[in-house]
């Protein structure tokens, strides 16, 4: 268990993200991030957006998510499922940039996040209208990422993962307490992040990334221990193996379980839920917040 006092945190508590154009994303109350996958091999087939020159399917799905209450749309062009195909930066950009430009033109006030571990893709994405960079590798797969984000001055989602999407399933052995290792990992990364000039950071413990379902359940149970770091926490649980595998189900059958685990994440301090099913997640946030209202600052 983590015993560190609040005075020992790396950052002062910060629950508002400053996005390009001076727009503020307020995470004092939990928010929902909707997933839009541009990949043909994402683990949940219904999350895959059809590839179209006019982006009709993408814009329709985005509008549905925003109307349902999504605060952020997270656009991904590189599949991070276990064993996913590795694609080049050029192909990732080719998938990403036209779709991102279409989203920004259609929804100028929406908060748009781009899921990438490549600094070159992040730079092009911000130029095309992205507000947030969501990096599954925490800067480990591209040493230029931190300096790039610091220069771009955009919020950064720092995730924990070992290995790569292709090898992470082989890296589930933790020499010591897993959650303690995660806190140490984040602390070390945050030192480098501060040195790079990055101000706004969200922590993602990486459910399912180099973690077995049992380890992910332990992490969820102890998610509140990450609050010693003083930063908002993102929970990405939606339809993952830790939801459906213990139940003998498929990702397509995992919505009820996702709702249950999202509620647990909220009760343990999560401020951002990354989900495929926005309406259900928004209702979960509303009901948990109604039952357990946040203290007035």
Where is each model-derived feature located?
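Hydrophobic "anchor" residues on beta-strands that sit immediately upstream
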Residues: 33, 70, 111, 131, ...
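Hydrophobic residues within beta-strands of alpha/beta enzymes
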Residues: 65, 73, 133, 201, ...
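N-terminal glycine-rich anion-binding loops that anchor highly charged ligand groups
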Residues: 25-38, 66-76
């Amino acid at each position: 268990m983590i015993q560190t006092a609040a005075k020992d945190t790396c950052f002062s508590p910060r629950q508002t993200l400053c996005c390009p154009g001076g727009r503020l994303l307020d995470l004092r109350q939990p928010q929902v991030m909707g997933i839009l996958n541009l990949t043909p091999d994402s683990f949940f087939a219904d999350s895959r957006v059809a590839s179209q020159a006019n982006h009709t399917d993408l814009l329709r799905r985005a509008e549905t998510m925003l109307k349902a209450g999504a605060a952020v749309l997270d656009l991904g062009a590189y599949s991070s499922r276990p064993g996913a195909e590795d694609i080049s930066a050029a192909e990732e950009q080719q998938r990403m940039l036209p779709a991102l430009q279409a989203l920004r033109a259609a929804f100028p006030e929406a908060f748009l996040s781009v899921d990438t571990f490549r600094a070159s893709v992040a730079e092009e994405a911000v130029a095309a209208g992205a507000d947030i960079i969501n990096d599954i590798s925490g800067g480990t797969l591209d040493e230029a990422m931190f300096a790039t984000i610091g220069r771009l001055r955009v919020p950064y989602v720092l995730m924990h993962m070992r290995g790569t999407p292709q090898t992470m399933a082989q890296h589930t052995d933790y020499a010591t307490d897993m959650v303690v290792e995660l806190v140490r990992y984040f602390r070390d990364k945050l030192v480098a992040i501060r040195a790079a000039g990055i101000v706004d950071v969200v922590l993602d413990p990486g459910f399912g990334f180099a973690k077995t379902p049992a380890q992910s359940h332990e992490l969820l149970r102890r998610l509140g221990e990450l609050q010693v770091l003083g930063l908002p926490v993102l929970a990405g649980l939606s339809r993952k193996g830790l939801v459906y595998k213990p139940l003998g189900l498929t990702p397509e059958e995992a919505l009820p379980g996702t709702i249950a685990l999202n509620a647990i994440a909220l009760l343990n301090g999560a401020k951002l839920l990354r989900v495929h099913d926005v309406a259900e997640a928004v209702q979960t946030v509303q009901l948990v917040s109604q039952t357990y209202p946040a203290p007035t600052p």
